[in-house]
Structures are given as structure tokens and as C-alpha cells.
């Protein structure tokens, strides 16, 4: 199982056995991130990561151009340049946010129906390559899960303590809704997770990982990876808050998880 983080290199911070790195490839205008947006870049080549670290990227391309094939050449070049260890790709992560109003990209013309076609198109472009394609949601209910089509390489969840979720019950609901309504025996991943309360991070990380590892053990290793998320520019009280280099308990918890992920293949 891959192990890593979004926005920071855990390996450079002293965590051993890091095998994954996640990044959102947002539209940037005048040095500022534009979000939500459906005009994000498609890199000319797969970004370089440290040896042994698999890159996991979220893209936000123009959906109409994508569905008419105008972006196929650029996407094939991007996907085809993934390194030998492969890569992980998704588009419009957390599109299920504000599901009751059609999702958080609906005001930009990316409806749920169109999103399902986008996911299918990108999955087809990744088929036969070294890149695994999937969908990332931020809700566990049926309305959120139905933002995912069947047939993807993986299905991932962003899951945060400050949303005050029913931790295990929520994860079980996500799995059950996927299995009953979208995809039998899905490959699952935790694409982002953290607690905004530093003292709760060790138990939060361990519990979320334990749930995913249990699913993997019960289903022949059908878990792709586990990524924490860090906002280096945010204070305590945001989704994550910054990495705290003196937080020995969290560092120890992540080190243990990394070692377990290395063995869970």
C-alpha cells in the first residue's frame, strides 16, 4: 500500500518508508490559486518525484474540451511519461462537495452527469498505462458516492477530524454505498486525512489507517494507499494545520503506519 502526504515530502521530514506524494494541479492566476476552476493545467510530462515515490495528481481540465477529445494528445503525453513505478491520477477531487446543489463545480458547468463521463474518458486514457485512475470524494453518503462511475481503478476518500464524522461508521457507510451502488469489490484509498487538533492526530491517523488496512486484509490487498494532508500556510483550526516538527507522538504514529504500509502489498 502506498504511503505519503499531500503538499509536503514526509521523507524529507524524517519519516521512513515514504512511497507516495500527492499534489493538486490547480489553475494559478497572478500567483494565486483559482478554486473552484475547470481551467487547470495539464503538465507536458509527469512531475519528477524522489526515487521510489509514486506521484498522485489531481487535474482540473476544461471538461468540454476533454469530452470532445481536444485534450487527448496532451493527456496521453502526460500519462505516458509516468515513471517506471507508475502514477496515480484523478480529476476534480471532492466534486461531491455541496452535493445537494449538484456539486461544487456545477456552477462552472461541470454537472454530475458530465463528471461521470469525464471520469470514464480519463479512465479509458489511462487503461494499459502505468497510471491508475480513480475518483476522490469527501462524503460517505449515497448522494456523494454517486459522483463516481463504475469501472475505475480506485475510489478514494478525503476524511477529516474537524468535520466531526462518525469515524468508523462513516467509513463503513462509504464502503457499503460504493459496493452496493457503484462498484463491487472496489480498490479503496484514503487520499487526504488529518486532525486539526495536534493531540488527536496519533489516534486519528492510526484509526483511519487501521480501518483501511482491515479492508485490505479482508479483500486481498484491495487498498491503493494512505495519504495525510498538510496545509503549511494554515494555522491550527484549518483542515489540518501545519506540520509540527516537535510533535514526537504524531511522527511516531506516521512512522508506524509507513512501516505497515510497506508490508501491506
Residue spans of the language-model regions?
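Boundary/entry segment of secreted carbohydrate-active catalytic domains
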Residues: 1-41
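Structural preference for beta-strand elements that scaffold enzyme active sites
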Residues: 2-3, 29-33, 52-58, 86-90, ...
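Active-site beta-loop-alpha junctions enriched in small/polar residues
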Residues: 6-13, 35-39, 60-62, 92-96, ...
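Aromatic-lined carbohydrate-recognition surfaces of secreted/lumenal glycan-active proteins
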Residues: 6-7, 116-144, 185-199, 224-232
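Substrate-binding cleft of secreted/luminal carbohydrate-active enzymes
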Residues: 8, 85-93, 193-265
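Acidic (Asp/Glu)-rich catalytic clusters
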Residues: 18-28, 41-56, 73-86, 145-150, ...
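Aromatic- and acid-rich polysaccharide-binding/catalytic face
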Residues: 27-30, 34-36, 57, 143-175, ...
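Substrate-binding cleft of extracellular glycoside hydrolase catalytic domains
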Residues: 37-138, 230, 242-245
